[in-house]
């Protein structure tokens, strides 16, 4: 009998390697399902084992191809519901469609994050688990419980293992100050802020650096790296101000377009990301990019949800500061 007899984990095609690592930590087998496509491109899902009354988790990021991966979650949830699963949790480490979380004044645009929340709920999902939401307020778009866990303990563990000298934490923009301040506090080090203005989407201009980075090892922390334009410009600005080294730690490795090439040819000494999104072949081959797995943290979170234990306990300030929250 498995260690967690009522817990089952299924996955789609988005990130099967992460799912395998999570169930390995839980000492259970990955749920068997046939996930593919019909000849016309429609998503096809069939569960290959009994789920009646079980506590089921669908572990799947909605990274690219975003629409296919989202539809796999929705169709799998429907299949689980019709097969009488006891509880269905969508564990979505990277929650796509999170960037449109409001309707700017006079703009005729959707609030896509709310739309996706409605779709997940309508499909029969009882609970959502995600990692480092792009905007915390998205939790309020759901009428079901949402656990937004943080990759901070995983990243801090990796940072401490590197034993960096003369470290200073850098927020890449004003919006990331809360995250950067929490990391700086846990590491008992200084904080710097990059003040930038973004003239249009995915284009950033570094304007000013608040804090003295001369001769320091600069640690940029962010929730995601998309095109890497902002990150590379920030690294150049820090080096121009006398930074000795520039490192970047981020949760989600989106790496759109020429992001990997930009990182490879930039002033960044090392980029560390988690495995919420699988790396492309180019990213895996890049010597400047390294992965710190979040599988252990996700496994412990799933275990706690299954056993009705506190999830917020994992992010107790003292435990995070010492690394004791990780399994």
Curated annotation (Swiss-Prot):
It is an enzyme of class 2 (transferase). GO terms for biological process: 5-phosphoribose 1-diphosphate biosynthetic process; purine nucleotide biosynthetic process; ribonucleoside monophosphate biosynthetic process. It catalyses: D-ribose 5-phosphate + ATP = 5-phospho-alpha-D-ribose 1-diphosphate + AMP + H(+). The keyword Transmembrane helix does not apply. Pathway: Metabolic intermediate biosynthesis; 5-phospho-alpha-D-ribose 1-diphosphate biosynthesis; 5-phospho-alpha-D-ribose 1-diphosphate from D-ribose 5-phosphate (route I): step 1/1. SUPFAM superfamilies: PRTase-like (SSF53271). GO terms for cellular component: cytoplasm; ribose phosphate diphosphokinase complex. PROSITE patterns: PRPP_SYNTHASE (PS00114). The keyword Transferase applies. CDD domains: PRTases_typeI. D-ribose 5-phosphate binds at residues 198, 222, 226-230. Coiled coil: none annotated. The active site is at 196. Its EC number is 2.7.6.1. Binds 2 Mg(2+) ions per subunit. Keywords: ATP-binding, Cytoplasm, Kinase, Magnesium, Metal-binding, Nucleotide biosynthesis, Nucleotide-binding, Transferase. Its cofactor is Mg(2+). Its main location: cytoplasm. GO terms for molecular function: ATP binding; kinase activity; magnesium ion binding; ribose phosphate diphosphokinase activity. SMART domains: Pribosyltran_N. Mg(2+) 1 binds at residue 134. Belongs to the ribose-phosphate pyrophosphokinase family. Class I subfamily. Involved in the biosynthesis of the central metabolite phospho-alpha-D-ribosyl-1-pyrophosphate (PRPP) via the transfer of pyrophosphoryl group from ATP to 1-hydroxyl of ribose-5-phosphate (Rib-5-P). Homohexamer. This is Ribose-phosphate pyrophosphokinase.
């Amino acid at each position: 009998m498995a260690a967690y007899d009522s817990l089952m984990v299924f996955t789609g095609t988005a990130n099967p390697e992460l799912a395998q690592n999570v169930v390995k930590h839980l000492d259970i087998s990955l749920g068997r399902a046939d996930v593919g496509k019909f000849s016309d491109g429609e998503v096809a899902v069939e569960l290959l084992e009994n789920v009646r009354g079980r506590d089921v988790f669908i572990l799947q990021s909605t990274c690219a191809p975003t629409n296919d991966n989202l539809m796999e979650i929705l169709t799998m949830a429907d299949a689980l519901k019709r097969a009488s699963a006891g509880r269905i949790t969508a564990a979505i480490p990277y929650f796509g469609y999170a960037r449109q979380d409001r309707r700017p004044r006079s703009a005729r645009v959707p609030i896509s994050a709310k739309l996706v929340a409605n779709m997940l709920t309508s499909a029969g999902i009882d609970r959502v688990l995600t990692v480092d939401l792009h905007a915390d307020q998205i939790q309020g778009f759901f009428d079901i419980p949402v656990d937004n866990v943080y990759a901070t303990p995983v990243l801090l563990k990796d940072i401490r293992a590197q034993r960096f000298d003369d470290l200073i934490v850098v927020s890449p923009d004003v919006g990331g100050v809360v995250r950067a301040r929490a990391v700086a506090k846990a590491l008992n080090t200084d904080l710097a802020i990059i003040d930038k203005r973004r003239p249009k989407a995915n284009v950033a201009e570094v304007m000013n650096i608040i804090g003295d980075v001369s001769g320091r090892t600069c640690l940029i922390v962010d929730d995601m790296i998309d095109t890497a334009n902002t990150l590379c410009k920030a690294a150049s600005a820090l080096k121009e101000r006398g930074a000795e080294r520039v490192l970047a730690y981020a949760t989600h490795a989106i790496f759109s377009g020429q992001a990997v090439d930009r990182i490879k040819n930039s002033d960044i000494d090392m980029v560390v990301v988690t495995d919420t999104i699988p790396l492309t072949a180019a990213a895996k081959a890049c010597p400047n990019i390294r992965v710190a797995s979040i599988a252990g943290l996700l496994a412990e979170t799933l275990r706690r949800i299954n056993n009705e234990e506190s999830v917020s306990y994992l992010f107790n300030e003292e435990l995070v500061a010492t690394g004791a929250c990780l399994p």
